[in-house]
Swiss-Prot record, chain B:
Binding site residues for Mg(2+): S22, T40, D64
Protein name, entry field: Ras-related protein Rab-39B
Region ranges (Switch-II): 67-83
EC nos: 3.6.5.2
Organism name: Bos taurus
Lipid moiety-binding residues (S-geranylgeranyl cysteine): C211, C213
Region described as Switch-I: spans on this chain: 35-43
One Pfam match: Ras
Lineage: Eukaryota, Metazoa, Chordata, Craniata, Vertebrata
Keyword rRNA-binding applies: no
Parts forming coiled coils: none
Positions with a binding annotation for GTP: S17, G20, K21, S22, C23, S37, T40, G67, H123, K124, D126, A154, R155
GO molecular function: G protein activity; GTP binding; GTPase activity; myosin V binding
Length: 488, 213
């Protein structure tokens, strides 16, 4: 078929006298060529289309694999529609009402739109909070970062097989999941040289990758780390993590005293069970459905969500933890039983987290931590090595108790200051309101006086005497002022 | 119901990232090799009973630590209350062997005034073809620091029991001799619930020793 036009072409070249036929032939030839070319183009186009279909099928397949987890809380149809509307606004970068988002998020998030919703929440967060210049990440594109080499390569490679090792998307050695994870972690380690790579980050990156593309995940990782400040806890000195452990311990002390005492008696400090909660945002131990829900709230509120979830988890299981009688059984419970709770329990936890507000306490405890550290340092300078240990121990215990008492007092004082401050604020706003009221009244008064002047000029002199009489009357009875003033 | 034990020892397992600390512990406490595992973020805890002599059981509390350097600010807090330690390196990773010295220094600073009885463990000995550290040089280094040396494999279950029980025995001897004593405010060694039978046999052993002197 394909050769035929050529044969005709070749044979037709020598025959001179039969020009008409030749022309006819060449026309045929041309049309045949046209047809052939046309078909070739069509073929190519179909092939391309086919490839596209295949790619989208692959993507769908991988999306299915990525999102294959049981959701905590089912999303109603109406909620889906509201999210659709919100996501449209997202493109226009319109600032949404916080209260509104909060309600919507509480209702649920469909997992198929979760990635987009996180990006929407990040945008909203950025519209409300601007980062000071100092804390901004360097402005280098993801593609540019991928071209470079990282000193953290070994540490990252080693963790690839240990991040969600049983999840089908990440389990294949150097499969698509692990490759994306490597790229993302490498790029971040190059962007944030101070943090580089810290164990725990791979889980956060992994959760993001299950819901969006690599580049979007990079943008969202940047958001969590810089805008919301999660990067602090991964810094080489891990100071911030220590503070967080202290804050959690204090929260337990203040709100769940029995549980706190029980854990203290058995020498279980938060660093033993809560470090992975903070560093992997619950992703290394808890089910993906729960983790995704926690991430929903993190994208809305930031780092304090981890405390809320931790507190809610511990308090919801308080009776069971109290029943564990020794160190081993408590650790076992916190490590294995707690992350394994059922979906309805998880839903309850999430609902509780939406209703909590502990930002003031967290702030106060952070201040406390620093005060305590300073005091500890001073006292360690003061004491001498030769003193008997027992005495020091006793003094230490006493000081500890004293510290606790003082801390409680400090907290009360903080609360008092807070109420006083809010009172003051109220008074100040009232004062300014009053001041502006006075100003408007004065202006009004001047206007009236002017009107009176004008009226006086317009009136004949004999009427003026009458008027003055009236005015005197008015001064005695100010309620009539407005009425008379309006009369020309 | 709490099992009956004579003493409780607290052990700590340290060493570079990915030398196989968690796998070794899990082989010892759970009796299986974990094909997939998460990295240890912070510290983790395991426990097991060991019978060192018929009727004499010791409870081991084993603390697993994160290997990545920046986690030391957290794991450090757990050195002080440990009586024994397994210092791991990977025989197929020379770097992890070179860091042994640094690990010892690190613990020394933070364990004072107490001391940790260490055993040096060359791990992953099933991967002999990829070996980068010879047995001879590891033994030499261990001797220089007054430690025992043992090679183990969690995958093939080689010497895992031995590594833990030998260390436990050594500590037990030190406790018996009075070189390590139970102290208030220190969790390294605790004495447990001792039934009368065991107690009396202990007394017998003690009096016999006294006679020998």
């Amino acid at each position: 078929m394909e050769e035929e036009p050529l044969v005709i072409f070749m044979s037709g070249e020598d025959d001179d006298p039969e020009k008409a036929e030749e022309r006819k032939k060449s026309e045929e030839l041309r049309s045949l060529w046209r047809k052939a070319i046309h078909q070739q183009i069509l073929l190519l186009r179909m092939e391309k289309e086919n490839q596209k279909l295949e790619a989208s099928r692959d993507e769908l397949q991988s999306r299915k694999v990525k999102l294959d987890y049981e959701e905590v809380g089912v999303c109603q149809k109406e909620v889906l529609l509201t999210w659709d509307k919100k996501l449209l606004n997202c493109r226009a970068k319109i600032r949404s009402d916080m209260e509104d988002i909060h309600i919507c998020l509480k209702e649920g998030v469909p997992k198929s739109r979760r990635g987009e919703i996180w990006q929407f929440l990040a945008l909203q967060y950025r519209l409300r909070h601007r980062l000071p210049n100092k804390q901004q990440p360097p402005d280098v594109s993801y593609k540019e970062l991928l071209k470079q080499l990282t000193v953290q390569q070994h540490a990252i490679l080693v963790d690839l097989g240990r991040t969600f090792p049983t999840h089908p998307y990440f389990s294949a050695q150097l499969g698509a999941g692990q490759l994306s994870l490597f790229n993302l972690l490498k790029a971040y380690s190059l962007l944030d040289k101070e943090v580089g790579y810290c164990q725990g980050i791979s889980f956060v990156a992994g959760v993001l990758l299950l819901h969006m593309s690599e580049e979007q995940a990079f943008e969202m990782l940047k958001f969590l780390m810089y805008d919301q400040g999660f990067r602090k806890q991964y810094r080489p000195d891990m100071m911030s993590l220590q503070i967080q452990m202290y804050q959690l311990s204090r929260l337990l002390h203040d709100y769940h005293r029995d549980l706190y005492n029980h854990l203290e008696e058995n020498e279980i400090s938060p660093s033993l069970y809560a470090a992975p909660w903070f560093l992997t945002l619950f992703a290394s131990q808890f089910s993906l459905g729960f983790v995704a829900r926690v991430f929903d709230i993190i994208f809305l509120q930031g780092t304090e969500v981890i405390f809320k979830v931790a507190l809610s988890l511990l308090s919801s299981q308080e009776t069971l933890i109290m029943e564990c009688e020794n160190f081993e059984s408590i650790v076992e419970f916190l490590k294995t039983t707690l992350p394994d709770m059922n979906t309805s329990e998880m839903e309850k936890i999430i609902t509780q987290v939406f209703e909590m507000d502990i930002s003031k306490q967290l702030h106060a405890y952070e201040v406390e931590y620093h005060v305590l550290q300073d005091e500890l340092q001073e006292s360690s300078y003061a004491c001498e090595d030769s003193e008997p240990l027992e005495k020091l121990e006793r003094a230490n215990n006493q000081l500890k108790r004293q510290n606790m008492d003082l801390l409680e007092k400090l907290q009360l004082a903080h609360a008092k200051i807070q109420t006083l401050e809010s009172n003051l604020e109220n008074l100040l706003t009232r004062e300014t309101k009053m001041k502006s009221l006075i100003r408007t009244l004065e202006q009004e008064k001047m206007a009236y006086q002017k009107t009176v002047e004008q009226i006086r000029k317009l009136l004949p002199t004999d009427a003026l005497a009458n008027c003055e009489f009236l005015l005197r009357d008015l001064n005695c009875n100010p309620n009539n002022k407005a009425k008379t003033g309006n009369k020309p | 119901m709490e099992a009956i034990w004579l003493y409780q020892f607290r052990l700590i397992v340290i060493g570079d990232s990915t030398v196989g600390k968690s796998c070794l512990i899990r082989r010892f406490t759970e009796g299986r090799f974990a094909q997939v595992s998460d990295p240890t973020v912070g510290v983790d805890f395991f426990s097991r009973l060991v019978e060192i002599e018929p009727g004499k059981r010791i409870k081991l509390q084993i603390w697993d630590t994160a290997g990545q350097e920046r986690f030391r600010s957290i794991t450090r807090a757990y050195y002080r209350n440990s009586v024994g330690g397994l210092l791991l390196f990977d025989i197929t990773n020379r770097r992890s062997f070179q860091n042994v010295h640094e690990w010892l220094e690190e613990t020394k600073v933070h364990v004072q005034p107490y001391q940790i009885v260490f055993v040096l463990v060359g791990h992953k000995c099933d991967l002999d073809t990829q070996r980068q550290v010879t047995r001879h040089e590891a033994e030499k280094l261990a001797a220089a620091y007054g430690m025992k040396y043992i090679e183990t494999s969690a995958r093939d279950a080689i010497n895992v029991e031995k590594a833990f029980t030998d260390l436990t025995r050594d500590i037990y001897e030190l406790v018996k001799r009075g070189d390590i004593t139970i102290q208030e405010g220190w969790e390294g060694v605790k004495s447990g619930f001792v039934p009368n039978v065991v107690h009396s046999s202990e007394e017998v052993v003690k009096s016999e020793r006294r006679c020998l002197c």
